Amino acid sequence: MRGLRLARQDALEKIFALYAACVRWMNEVSIHQWNDTDYLSAYPPDDYADMQRRGLLFVLEGENGALLGAVVLLPEDERWNGRPSRRAWYVHNLVTAIGASGAGKAILREAEKLAKPHGMEVMRLDCADDNTRLNAWYESQGYFPCGTCIDGPYNGILREKLL
């Protein structure tokens, strides 16, 4: 796998296709998260185009140039309001290609590497509170629970990793 890099505008269609494929896969394997929250309407292609223009959308590619995953790294997140203030990047919209073993772990590690030279102290993310498998995976990656959030129908666990 190549390192994480800023997404180019010409990759936006392929990036959004990853999210659509992930939602279909969740339906097929009965995982209830993005597919139950109208995710593709909540985060339409224009949102990703905006994140790309702002330098917040990143991609992970394979050695052959194939798109393996994408992530948005935000400098702030209102779900964390009222929490201890630390210099943080907020991981959002992390997606991997179906079958791209190790891509999610690689995205997190590469994002963490990028964060340090920018003076970040922590990486933060949230995960649906009823997705026990994904919460366990995030914990295995060093992202520990430190609170909860509610955003409309979404109930999440706030997770943080010290860098």
Please report, for each region that a protein language model flagged, where it lies by residue:
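Conserved acetyl-CoA-binding loop-helix of GNAT-fold acetyltransferases
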Residues: 101-113, 136-140
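A short beta-loop-alpha structural element at the N-terminal edge
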Residues: 2-18, 24-26
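Conserved beta-strand-loop-alpha-helix junction that forms the acyl-donor binding cleft
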Residues: 125-135, 151-154
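Conserved beta-strand in the GNAT
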Residues: 59, 66-75, 90, 95
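Conserved GNAT acetyl-CoA-binding A-motif
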Residues: 115-127
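A short, internal acetyl-CoA/4′-phosphopantetheine-binding micro-motif in the GNAT/acyltransferase core
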Residues: 91-102, 128
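Conserved GNAT-fold acetyl-CoA-binding loop/helix
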Residues: 20-47
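A short helix-loop-beta-strand connector motif used in the catalytic cores of GNAT acetyltransferases and
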Residues: 43-59
